[in-house]
Amino acid sequence: MAEVEQKKKRTFRKFTYRGVDLDQLLDMSYEQLMQLYSARQRRRLNRGLRRKQHSLLKRLRKAKKEAPPMEKPEVVKTHLRDMIILPEMVGSMVGVYNGKTFNQVEIKPEMIGHYLGEFSITYKPVKHGRPGIGATHSSRFIPLK
């Protein structure tokens, strides 16, 4: 009976980014992280983060520090869609501007190395309705309501 209870305990897959644990990623320097990223991200980090990116990281750190334990931090709004997600951003809540509104994005470990803009769609996907007059040649035979 005890063996059955032991089997019921679920084991979750530990996150790794290119074979490196999240805890080790947090301890790495930017130079070591750059070796793990793809060429585009390496080039971007090699050229350096600008003042706006540094201020976003500072605001994210502050929001995480002020959050009560076991609670999500306050949402930090930003227009920086081209910011690469770094390991220190994991667990933060970011409002990414899509041109009209700020979409809330919770940064997860799987997002490391991607851009913030990839998680905030800038257009409304098309919902196709019924064809109207002039839509196609065959739509002439569709009865009007």
Swiss-Prot record:
One Pfam family named in its UniProt record: Ribosomal_S19
GO function term, MF aspect, one: DNA binding
Acetylation recorded as keyword: yes
SUPFAM superfamilies: Ribosomal protein S19
UniProt modified residues of type N-acetylalanine: 2
Annotated keywords: Acetylation, Cytoplasm, Isopeptide bond, Ribonucleoprotein, Ribosomal protein, Ubl conjugation
Location in chain, cross-link Glycyl lysine isopeptide (Lys-Gly) (interchain with G-Cter in SUMO2): 108
Family listed: Belongs to the universal ribosomal protein uS19 family.
Protein name: Small ribosomal subunit protein uS19
Originating species: Homo sapiens (Human)
Name of the coding gene: RPS15
